[in-house]
Amino acid sequence: MTADISLRPADHPAIKSGKIGVLLVNLGTPDGTDYTSMRRYLKEFLTDRRVIEWSPWKWYPILFGIVLNTRPQKVGKAYELIWNKEKNESYLRTYTRNQAELMAKRLHDLANVKVDWAMRYGTPSIASRIETLKQEGCDRILLFPLYPQYAAATTATVNDKAFQKLLSMRWQPALRTVPDYHDDETYIEALAQSVERHLSSLDWKPDMLLASFHGIPMSYFKQGDPYYCQCQKTGRLLRERLGLTQENFMVTFQSRFGPEEWLQPYTDKTVEKLAQDGVKRIAVINPGFVSDCLETLEEIAEQAAHSFHENGGDKFTHIPCLNDSDDGMKVLEKVVRRELQGWV
């Protein structure tokens, strides 16, 4: 609702209000594949205390002395393999932008709602988008971290950054944060249909379906992070919906970094062992990723496939993420409409 303009003093500045913002946020992406862009992105990502919980005095000498001098070039080459050449950006940026634009169309019946998107690391930043929404008259904002399963290193750090922005604002918008939706029926159904649709396009049937989630250090789980349990539940619900057994369906964890023990079983080791044990055909889906990105397009579709074939496997297929598909957008829309209740 906008205040009655006739009641304002003649010299009162025009102030937009009465709008509701929906801010979709994903992890982030470098602006380019060059060394400088990669280093800037990795620095922001790897200095986040939610991501690397080691004390700075222990971690920073390793980060600034070794990691940021060696990994930008290596990771940049990996990004080059899966870069959206047409738009000169990563596919994560492409899909996240598309999701925001499609969400705005799906919420066309809610006249006071504005939809925008941001990245936790890189651009556009969460702070800049909150500021933009506020300037456009949004005095209430729904913050949607695009992670079906909650983890401190993903969902919590998005929330942290939003609250950090609010600390600097004199006139703060009301802020709601979207909880996880790891067991949502629409989400599970969308995953199941994506599996069925993809497998029906093949002329072979997999002996094993892996549901590969991004890993976190085991120490984070032991300190109370619910991520592992939520991944397992998502996996179980998907397996049951597909009518599979534990003999032909596994939950695994990928993308480990550093010397610590991470959640297991590890995806790369599992793929290698399956091939060595004589399993000839496997499919891999990434239920925890809303959009395809480096970890799915390069780490799974390229690296894992190569490892499987090198160790004796025959057929390997990667099932795309839901991305900006109609089924994927149905999931996101359902969550947004649910969380907007009481505001619209």
UniProtKB/Swiss-Prot annotation:
One of its GO terms (cellular component) is cytoplasm. PROSITE patterns: FERROCHELATASE. Fe cation binds at residues 214, 295. CDD domains: Ferrochelatase_C, Ferrochelatase_N. It catalyses: heme b + 2 H(+) = protoporphyrin IX + Fe(2+). GO terms for molecular function: ferrochelatase activity; metal ion binding. The keyword Lyase applies. Pathway: Porphyrin-containing compound metabolism; protoheme biosynthesis; protoheme from protoporphyrin-IX: step 1/1. It is found in: Cytoplasm. Keywords: Cytoplasm, Heme biosynthesis, Iron, Lyase, Metal-binding, Porphyrin biosynthesis. GO terms for biological process: heme biosynthetic process. Pfam families: Ferrochelatase. InterPro entries: Ferrochelatase, Ferrochelatase_AS, Ferrochelatase_C, Ferrochelatase_N. The keyword Cell inner membrane does not apply. Its EC number is 4.98.1.1. SUPFAM superfamilies: Chelatase (SSF53800). NCBIfam families: hemH (TIGR00109). Belongs to the ferrochelatase family. Catalyzes the ferrous insertion into protoporphyrin IX. This is Ferrochelatase. It comes from Rhizobium etli (strain ATCC 51251 / DSM 11541 / JCM 21823 / NBRC 15573 / CFN 42). The gene is hemH.
